[in-house]
Swiss-Prot record:
Name listed for the protein in its UniProt record: Uronate isomerase
One biological process term in Gene Ontology: D-galacturonate catabolic process
Gene Ontology terms, MF aspect: glucuronate isomerase activity
Signal sequence segment: none
Catalytic activity: D-glucuronate = D-fructuronate; aldehydo-D-galacturonate = keto-D-tagaturonate
Family: Belongs to the metallo-dependent hydrolases superfamily. Uronate isomerase family.
Length: 469
């Protein structure tokens, strides 16, 4: 590595342990990337067009970036974040880039700083930190790179050594971009994941219309409970035809329910007609998690649950800029009681995989590791979102390994919209895990040959196996 990234990044300071971490890392640094969960756009791979200017690629869509800048008084309009009402925002990519570079010091100590340093150094060959003075030269260099064929999406997919990448797609998506990828003959593997929030959450914008659309595209009668469930089965099968191996569920809580079908049907009728109160809407979401788990047992799709985010905390930002604009905040999350109805129904099934994530780190050792350490259907997803920093990944290992071990976890997933940062995120995860394993060997808690095997599993094998890729 060159420039902004030290070869010993994130390795232990103690010399003997650091030397072992280096050796472990040398064994895994070149392994292919399995990216089983993320938010890149299938359109990029289908069209394989040049990315836009540096700001539109690296700044405007990245909520990790603009939320920090916003916290320091820089308006989202100044960063080019589009407003829903079409009101003016900055469109000059160079001006947006300059604001970012002038404030690069704000990211010191954050994972965003590591990801950007890595991307600038390893992808663009830059060895100078962003600053007011370096802003224009860096912009010109990155912009020139983006005009070249070797910086287009498919070329970068291959350069990053990606073996497979999953997008996250609405249950209502026609998967047209995925179809174009398959029709193109390109050998890259881009698969969808079934995200049904728009048709299982009564509080989702346009829910009644979404139910009608679900019926239209499946031919099922979504005016009835049985027809509604059949519509989900049809869509899941459609996603599987395009290579999907997983579903994803972004609920506010991990609450589940397992009502008798007659009660579930009556609840669905109230929800569909807009007559359900807040408790009934919550109960419906809980019931649907269990229904999705039962369907996963039937069709083999791995189920991911990403609960615990207070979405769109600022109503003013939501009204002006829409969802996913940096105002999603972690909340306390219960799993032991919340998941019990689902686990009572299907938790002992060895052929089911439910991957649990959390934004509440206090639940790692108290709830999640003990649950995954005994229920065959459960696995622990890696440190997520606010916690996918080097420190967050260390905390995850330290708080879960003693109870769940390594093999009830699923390796790493980058969960990103920022395509250029994917190799950075995987590299940092591999470094953190190699450092953790080296420490266990140094403390005589793990044999060195076991550490090498574990390093490969954590970097590659566990994700591939858990997500059935």
């Amino acid at each position: 590595m060159r420039g902004l990234i030290d070869p010993d990044l994130l390795f232990p300071a103690e010399e003997r342990t650091r030397a072992l971490a280096r050796r472990l890392y040398a064994e895994v640094s070149g392994l292919p990337i399995v990216s089983p969960h993320g938010h890149t756009e299938p359109r990029w791979y289908a069209l394989d067009e040049a990315f836009p200017d540096p700001a539109q690629l690296l700044i405007v869509p990245d909520h990790y970036v603009f939320r920090m800048l916003f916290s320091q008084g820089i308006r989202l309009e100044e960063l080019g974040v589009p407003a829903l009402d079409g009101s003016p925002v900055e469109t000059d990519g160079r001006a947006i880039w300059r604001r970012f570079c002038e404030n690069y010091h704000l990211f010191r100590g954050t994972p965003t700083r590591l990801w950007f340093d890595y991307t600038l150094s390893e992808l663009f060959g830059i060895d100078e930190l962003p600053s007011a003075a370096s802003s224009d030269p860096l912009y010109d260099h990155v912009a020139e790179c983006l005009t070249r064929p070797d910086y287009r999406p498919r070329a970068l997919y291959e350069r990053f050594n990606i073996e497979v990448i999953s997008t996250t797609d609405s249950a209502l998506d026609d998967l047209g971009w995925h179809a174009k990828i398959l029709e193109s003959g390109w050998k890259g593997r881009v698969v969808p994941a079934y995200r049904p929030d728009a048709v299982v959450d009564p509080d989702f914008q346009g829910f009644p219309t979404n139910l009608d659309k679900l019926g239209d595209i499946t031919g099922a009668d979504t005016g009835t409970w049985s027809g509604y469930l059949d519509a989900h089965r049809t869509r899941r099968a459609y996603f599987k035809d395009f290579g999907a191996t997983s579903t994803d569920h972004g609920h506010a809580t991990a609450d589940t329910a397992n009502l008798p079908q007659a009660e579930a049907a009556a609840l669905f009728d109230k929800v569909r007609l807009g007559k359900a109160n807040a408790d009934e809407r919550r109960l419906f979401r809980a019931q649907m998690l269990t229904e999705m788990a039962k369907m996963s047992l039937d069709d083999g799709l791995v189920m991911q649950i990403h609960p615990g985010s207070f979405r769109n905390h600022s109503p003013a930002i939501l009204a002006k800029f829409g969802r996913d604009k940096g105002f999603d905040i972690p909340t306390r999350t219960d799993y032991v009681t919340a998941l019990k109805p689902l686990l009572d129904a299907v938790g002992l099934e060895r052929d089911l995989t439910v991957i649990l994530f959390t934004l509440d780190e206090t639940s790692y050792a108290r709830e999640l590791a003990p649950l995954a350490g005994v229920y065959p259907a459960l696995k622990l997803g890696p440190a997520w979102w606010f916690h996918d920093s080097a420190e967050g990944m260390r905390r995850f290992r330290e708080m879960t390994t003693e109870t769940a071990g390594f093999y009830n976890t699923v390796g790493f997933n980058d969960d990103t919209r920022a395509f250029p940062s994917i190799p950075a995120r995987h590299d940092i995860a591999r470094r953190v895990d190699c450092a953790f394993l080296a420490r266990l060997v140094a403390e005589h808690r793990l044999r060195e040959d076991e550490a090498y095997e574990l390093a490969r599993d954590l970097a590659y094998g566990l994700a591939k196996e858990a997500y059935r890729l």
